[in-house]
Curated annotation (Swiss-Prot):
This is Lipid A 4'-phosphatase. Its main location: membrane. The chain crosses the membrane at residues 26-46, 58-78, 134-153, 160-182, 200-220. GO terms for molecular function: phosphatase activity. It is found in: Cell inner membrane. It holds the Pfam family PAP2. It comes from Porphyromonas gingivalis (strain ATCC 33277 / DSM 20709 / CIP 103683 / JCM 12257 / NCTC 11834 / 2561). When grown in low hemin conditions the major lipid A species are non-phosphorylated tetraacyl and 4'-phosphate pentaacyl lipid A, while under high hemin conditions the major lipid A species are non-phosphorylated tetraacyl and 1-phosphate tetraacyl lipid A (hemin is protoporphyrin IX containing Fe(3+) with a chloride ligand (CHEBI:50385) involved in the change from healthy to diseased gums). Keywords: Antibiotic resistance, Cell inner membrane, Cell membrane, Hydrolase, Lipid A biosynthesis, Lipid biosynthesis, Lipid metabolism, Lipopolysaccharide biosynthesis, Membrane, Transmembrane, Transmembrane helix, Virulence. The gene is lpxF. It is an enzyme of class 3 (hydrolase).
Length: 236
């Protein structure tokens, strides 16, 4: 056990120690919840524009269910139950961990709520759309978000791994609930699978928009961070 803890400590400090001004802004932005508001609006537009309203509403409902379950599990159950300090608050790490722009997060970090939420949403949406381009893209973006939690110093690796497991379970559960509800209430009025509704140029355009958004954050990370820090007091 001591060996495992030492390995995790060294690996965490190595991953956390890869600091660069450009990456500071990028990982700070990609980790912030409010940064994704514009893409959330774009996602709603993608779901509803020239698509069956009921089909889109079922997907929105499933996404909200996923977020609700993940938030409750991570914030209301795991964090207060295990009460494990984040690296940025842990007495054994606080002098060694590198934070970004002074952000340290809440007191407890087990499990990672960001990881749980993003993994669940990635699994659910990749199963909904069944598009390889989108699947590779969304999982790549999720990997960046997960690493950002280590980079900015607010999660241990052992906060991340259980978060991945819980996210996969929740994502699978929500997908099954969605399929059941969809077949029961939409029935013969809808295609056999929602991927038929969102196939073709529609899903490709949404995926390219997602890639473009992440690339824009990387290219303009320092400028965007300065603007957001000036106008928004709380990004997370």
């Amino acid at each position: 056990m001591e060996y495992i803890l030492e390995v995790e400590r060294n690996l965490f400090l190595t991953l956390n120690g890869v600091q660069h001004p450009l990456l500071d802004g990028f990982f700070y932005l990609i980790s912030a919840k409010w940064t994704w508001v514009i893409m959330s609006i774009a996602f709603l537009f993608f779901l509803f524009y020239k698509k069956p309203t009921k089909e889109a509403l079922f997907i929105v409902g499933a996404v909200l269910l996923s977020v609700l379950i993940c938030d409750q599990l991570s914030s209301s159950f795991f964090k207060p139950f295990f009460a494990r300090f984040r690296p940025s608050h842990h007495p054994d790490f606080i002098d060694y961990v590198k934070t970004v722009y002074g952000y340290r997060g809440g007191k407890y970090g087990f499990i990672s709520g960001h990881t749980t939420n993003y993994i669940s949403l990635a699994l659910f949406t990749s199963r909904i759309f069944r598009n390889k381009f989108y699947t590779w893209t969304i999982w790549s973006v999720v990997a960046l978000v997960i690493y950002s939690r280590i980079y900015i110093g607010v999660h241990f690796i052992t906060d991340i791994i259980p978060g991945i497991a819980v996210g996969l379970i929740v994502g699978h559960f929500v997908y099954k609930v969605y399929l059941y509800a969809r077949s029961r209430w939409l029935g013969a009025s809808c295609p056999a699978h929602p991927s038929a509704v969102y196939a073709g140029d529609s899903i490709r355009l949404w995926t390219l928009s997602l890639i473009g958004f992440v690339f824009a954050m990387l290219c303009m990370s320092r400028q965007l961070t300065e603007i957001l820090q000036y106008y928004v007091f709380l990004l997370f």
